[in-house]
Amino acid sequence: MKRIVLFGMALLCIVGMNAQDRFYYSGPQLSIAKNQFTCVSVGKLDGTADLNYQGMECWNEYIVSLQNGGMATTYKYGGMTVAKIGTFKLGSYGDKNTAKVASFSSQFFSREDKMPLLFVSQSHNEAVGGQKDVIFVERISANMKSSKLVAKIQFKEANKLFGNTLQWVVDKENKFLYGFGNTIDDSNASNKHRLVKFKLPTISVKAKGKNIPIINLSEKNLLENYLIEDYCPMFKSMASHGLMVKYGLLYMPVGMGTSSQPSTMYVWNLAKRKLQNAIDMSTSTTGELTDCAECMGELLIQSQDSIYKLRFE
């Protein structure tokens, strides 16, 4: 186990002290008694070989881990262990489904279900049936060994607000839906990052047969629409991965786990529109971080081979 001590400093000032494993970040504490957390791997991922890991989400003690194409693996989390339940294809499985972000809604499809509906971000450069950057709404079975596509959500942009891909995340506490993405792409020097906000759509549970209902969102439905750089010009463009909203904070793991693009956890204050924290994860984790989720009061982060637990103290 590696213990990391965190102290508040100026915005975006992250300094590593290798001898003591200290990292510095700005802003108020993340609802923690001390600016301190421990980081430890709680288990190796056991999904489908040769597929990159993408989205991850948790509900109670259960973890849903996604891979390219829409392969899913479920686990039971035991605090320091992860026990595999099953691996299966999502109902939205396909070569144009990156499954980049997994985010549970606050709505259950049926009282029998153990998990609410799962929102899966397509986040692919190409469209599926004329639809791009859609949200696939999945109903995980009670035994957590299969899933069914029950709806799609599409944002129909009129003014080309986003560039290559768009990621979606649910604010379950306040019932909002956020979209985050590049205006161009990460490799372009003129790229910016846009955040949009909608009321969380309600999914119809009456649809039957093979007709998958499609919910269309338009710019008329926007509650918020702004560029991160308008409020934080120093926001650094790096490869962005998963998203999580908790207590009004948007958690964004970015980077590739390399020296040129170190793994970092950005924490964006949604109400104040400010970068509250930027935490260097490069020595407490290894490789690319793909998504994060709150699980039983702890922050879990998925990499390309393991699940890490960050316990704030």
Residue ranges and their predicted role:
Residues 286-313:
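Blade-level signature of beta-propeller repeat domains, shared across WD40, Kelch, NHL, RCC1
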Residues 49-59, 96-116, 160-175, 236-246, ...:
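Structural signature of eukaryotic scaffold interfaces centered on beta-propeller domains
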Residues 4-13:
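Sec-dependent N-terminal signal peptides
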Residues 60, 66-68, 120-124, 179-183, ...:
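Recurrent small/Gly-Pro-centered beta-turn motifs in extracellular repeat architectures
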Residues 27-48, 86-97, 143-164, 205-236, ...:
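Surface-exposed loop and turn segments in beta-propeller and other repeat-based domains
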Residues 40-70:
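Beta-strand-rich domains and repeat architectures in extracellular enzymes and scaffolds
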Residues 221-270:
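Loop/turn-rich, solvent-exposed surfaces of beta-rich toroidal or solenoidal domains
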Residues 70-76, 115, 126-140, 185-200, ...:
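Structural motif
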